[in-house]
């Protein structure tokens, strides 16, 4: 049986400060939730080994700070990402409105090879709270308008849909990683113009 190389998937979680990015990450990786809120300074990551379609992969999940003043630190963290998770708080409409700018920010900073088809996943978090302000249909419509991004409604506190969401994140990230590998293995052939072809023919002539 041939051993397959270990796959490391880099996942970036973006969204405004306080939407629950760190809580979602901790719930998924450590099965823990804390009511004590502490803003993430800069960026931090956790890793978790998961099975994706009978393949063992390591997910490296990056939690990037939501405050504007830390965004300049994030450029290096965006690079090499295999999937981007956009998180908003269903009780705070402003955090939903900024999803557009977070998505654009990622595409600019990460510069993925195929931005049109890069895998995003949207999470509407804190559905355990009663004062909901962003309707499911509104979030679904936004996600659909952005190349049909998968959308999940989650609660980091109650562990609702967290596992399911990250399974989709892992699967889409693995697909992205595989496509990049194939692209690197079979790069586009070089195109020669007429002068180059004539020069090549002359150089290979043994007369």
Curated annotation (Swiss-Prot):
Its EC number is 3.6.5.2. It is found in: Cytoplasmic vesicle, Phagosome membrane; Late endosome membrane; Lysosome membrane; Melanosome membrane. InterPro entries: P-loop_NTPase (IPR027417), Small_GTP-bd (IPR005225), Small_GTPase (IPR001806). There is a cross-link at residues 191, 194 (Glycyl lysine isopeptide (Lys-Gly) (interchain with G-Cter in ubiquitin)). It is a peripheral membrane protein. GTP binds at residues 17-23, 34-35, 37, 40, 66, 125-126, 128, 156-157. Transmembrane segments: none annotated. Mg(2+) binds at residues 22, 40, 63. A motif (Switch 2) lies at residues 67-82. The modification N-acetylthreonine is found at residue 2. Deubiquitination at Lys-191 and Lys-194 by USP32. Phosphorylated at Ser-72 by LRRK1; phosphorylation is dependent on protein kinase C (PKC) activation of LRRK1. Its main location: membrane. It is an enzyme of class 3 (hydrolase). It catalyses: GTP + H2O = GDP + phosphate + H(+). Its cofactor is Mg(2+). One of its GO terms (biological process) is early endosome to late endosome transport. A lipid is attached at residues 205, 207 (S-geranylgeranyl cysteine). The modification Cysteine methyl ester is found at residue 207. SUPFAM superfamilies: P-loop containing nucleoside triphosphate hydrolases (SSF52540). Interacts with NTRK1/TRKA. Interacts with RILP. Interacts with PSMA7. Interacts with RNF115. Interacts with FYCO1. Interacts with the PIK3C3/VPS34-PIK3R4 complex. The GTP-bound form interacts with OSBPL1A. The GTP-bound form interacts with RAC1. Interacts with CLN3. Interacts with CHM, the substrate-binding subunit of the Rab geranylgeranyltransferase complex. Interacts with C9orf72. Does not interact with HPS4 and the BLOC-3 complex (heterodimer of HPS1 and HPS4). Interacts with CLN5. Interacts with PLEKHM1 (via N- and C-terminus). Interacts with PRPH; the interaction is direct. The small GTPases Rab are key regulators of intracellular membrane trafficking, from the formation of transport vesicles to their fusion with membranes. Rabs cycle between an inactive GDP-bound form and an active GTP-bound form that is able to recruit to membranes different sets of downstream effectors directly responsible for vesicle formation, movement, tethering and fusion. In its active state, RAB7A binds to a variety of effector proteins playing a key role in the regulation of endo-lysosomal trafficking. Switch I, switch II and the interswitch regions are characteristic of Rab GTPases and mediate the interactions with Rab downstream effectors. The switch regions undergo conformational changes upon nucleotide binding which drive interaction with specific sets of effector proteins, with most effectors only binding to GTP-bound Rab. This is Ras-related protein Rab-7a. It comes from Oryctolagus cuniculus. The gene is RAB7A.
């Amino acid at each position: 049986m041939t051993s397959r190389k270990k796959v490391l998937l880099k996942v970036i979680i973006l969204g405004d400060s306080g939407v629950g990015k760190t809580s979602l990450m901790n719930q998924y990786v450590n099965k823990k939730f804390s009511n004590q809120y502490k803003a993430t300074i800069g960026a931090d990551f956790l890793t978790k080994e998961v099975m994706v379609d009978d393949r063992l992969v390591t997910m490296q999940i990056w939690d990037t700070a939501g405050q504007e003043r830390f965004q300049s630190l994030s450029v290096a963290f965006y690079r090499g990402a295999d999937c981007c998770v956009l998180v908003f708080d269903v009780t705070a409409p402003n955090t939903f409105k900024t999803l557009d700018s977070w998505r654009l920010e990622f595409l600019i900073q990460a510069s993925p090879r195929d931005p049109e088809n890069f895998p995003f996943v949207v999470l509407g978090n804190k559905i355990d709270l009663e004062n909901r302000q962003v309707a499911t249909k509104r979030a679904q419509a936004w996600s659909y308008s952005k190349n049909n991004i998968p959308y999940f409604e989650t609660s980091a506190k109650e562990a609702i849909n967290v596992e399911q969401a990250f399974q989709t994140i892992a699967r889409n990230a693995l697909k992205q990683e595989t496509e990049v590998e194939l692209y690197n293995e079979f790069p586009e052939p070089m195109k020669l113009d007429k002068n180059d072809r004539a020069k090549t023919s002359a150089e290979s002539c043994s007369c």
